[in-house]
Design a protein with these regions (language model features):
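Conserved, mostly hydrophobic/aromatic
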Residues: 157, 177, 194, 230, ...
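Terminal RNA-binding accessory module
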Residues: 342-443
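Conserved SAM/AdoMet-binding glycine-rich loop
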Residues: 75-80, 85, 90, 186-314, ...
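Proteins enriched for Cys/Gly/acidic motifs involved in redox and nucleic-acid/cofactor modification
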Residues: 1-202, 241, 256, 278-285, ...
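Short, hinge-like loop/turn segments at secondary-structure boundaries
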Residues: 94-95, 117-119, 210-212, 246-248, ...
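Short flexible coil/turn linkers enriched for glycine and charged/polar residues
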Residues: 139-143, 153-155, 252, 262, ...
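Generic beta-strand/beta-sheet core signal
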Residues: 7, 195-197, 231-233, 259-261, ...
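Radical SAM enzyme [4Fe-4S]-AdoMet core and its adjacent flexible, acidic
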Residues: 11, 203-220, 224, 270-271, ...
């Protein structure tokens, strides 16, 4: 048997790519293993988005390279964004790697593996990407999955390398996405998390108009699917039709991830974002008016080149005033090849970290207060299984908690706990609240 081990790094979109590669490998007769010392071929699917992600990818590649000396590994393959972006440089710097395959070559993973294991020889020709994946092998628990509705991006944010790595926006057809989700639901997936670089831009390239609402109308008809969650939406592409379908369809979680990055109009202009403070505030007001129990998540960049203390304070005050349920802050990362990397008035790492930490400390208080508002309420929770914290706790999530990104609900009391399994839905009364986690009992 040919055994393959895969290390998946980066965002949920990269995880979907990993699952597609595993599907190709399984179809080609490879055996998958999560024991690195047993793998004949090691694959590292890398992330190249920001410096921290690149450093982690390099570290994991070097670790995997040691398996060729100390384990049964015969070949090492590096895939993903880092390979796409720095293939020539990495070939020189990492001679232990047998093959580098880019974003558009992942459907050839089985062919590359067969060639390497037989010949111990690198090589992968650039090919036209397959739009539709084979049946995926899920990395995460089997009751939820990420579904990538497009690849690439047409936004040209000044700090971002994604368009140069993954190209322009390429939507998948509605019918093929629905077919994939039907297959996932038939295998026990209860929740899908829709991902793309910009989910709200979906369909414009192939249908000449944005079609996320139409896609959602098709997905809600899938009988065995219970939760649909929208991630990576853009404020400038949100329309009333989309808000109305989220509000009216029970299966669509009242949870929206809207990365706004900043609130100051001058900074947004330098970021080459197409949104404005007025537009962002208006969208949040419309969402909360139409969907009173909506959970909003966003991400911000602290210390963008030229950001003044006054602009930072404006962002801080906006976060305090708005009260997002979930929020992440990244210290600005200077990425080569981007417009922002050439901007003057680059800010020191010390100041960037301070500004990030100030907002995160504020957000921890907001998150705690938001969670305290849930004490005494009964929420439907999707069970993950026994908690990694303690076998005495069962772990689940309510609609306001996205997998991996947000906190969880710990269940420590109630009837029928011994009969609860991963993938079950149960009603949980919240009894305790912490900054990011909730505690409750089954009722």
């Amino acid at each position: 048997m040919k055994k393959v081990g895969l290390i998946s790094l980066g965002c949920p979109k990269n995880q979907v790519d990993s699952e597609i590669m595993l599907g190709h490998l399984t179809k080609a007769g490879f055996t998958l293993t999560n024991k690195e010392n047993e793998a004949e071929i090691a694959i590292v699917n890398t992330c190249g988005f920001i410096n921290d992600a690149k450093e982690e990818s390099i570290e994991r590649i070097i670790e995997a390279g040691r398996l060729k000396e100390n384990g049964s590994c015969k070949a090492l393959i590096v895939a993903g964004c880092l390979s796409e972006r720095y293939k020539e440089e990495l070939t020189k710097e990492l001679p232990e790697v047998d093959a580098f395959i880019g974003i558009s070559e992942m459907e050839k993973i089985a062919d590359v593996c067969n060639a390497l294991i037989e010949l111990h020889n690198a090589g992968a020709q650039r090919t036209v990407p397959l739009q539709e994946p084979v049946s995926r092998i899920l990395i995460n628990p089997q009751h939820y999955a990420y579904v990538k509705i497009s690849d690439g991006c047409n936004n040209r944010c000044s700090y971002c390398t994604i368009p140069s790595i993954r190209g322009s926006y390429k939507s998948r057809e509605i019918e093929t996405i629905i077919n994939e989700v039907e297959q996932l639901a038939s295998k026990g997936v209860k929740e899908i998390n829709i991902v793309a670089q910009d989910t709200t831009d979906y369909g414009l390239d192939i249908y000449k108009k944005r079609k996320l609402s139409a896609l959602l109308k098709g997905l809600v008809k899938i009988k065995k699917l219970f939760w649909i969650r929208l991630l990576y939406t853009y404020p400038e592409h949100f329309d009333d039709e989309l808000i109305n379908i989220i509000a009216s369809e029970e299966k669509i979680c009242n949870y929206i991830d809207i990365p706004i990055q900043h609130i100051d109009d001058e900074i947004l202009r330098k970021m080459k974002r197409n949104s404005s403070e007025k537009q962002i505030r208006g969208l949040i007001e419309r969402l909360r008016r139409r969907i009173p129990d909506i959970v909003l998540r966003t991400s911000l960049i602290a210390g963008f080149p030229g950001e003044t203390e006054a602009q930072h304070k404006r962002l801080y005050d906006f976060v305090k005033e708005t009260g997002f349920h979930r929020l992440g802050v990244f210290a600005y990362s200077k990425e080569e090849g981007t417009a922002a990397s050439r901007y003057k008035n680059q800010i020191t790492q010390k100041i960037k970290d301070r500004r990030r930490n100030e907002i995160m400390r504020l957000q921890s208080k907001i998150s705690l207060n938001k969670n305290r508002e849930l004490i005494g309420k009964t929420l439907k929770a999707l069970i993950n299984g026994l908690s990694s914290e303690s076998e005495l706790l069962i772990e689940g999530r309510y609609y306001g908690q996205a997998p991996e990104a947000d906190g969880v609900v710990y269940i420590n009391d109630g009837t029928g706990l011994d009969k609860i399994r991963a993938g079950d839905f149960v009603n949980v009364k919240i009894t305790e609240a912490h900054q990011y986690e909730l505690v409750g009992k089954v009722i």
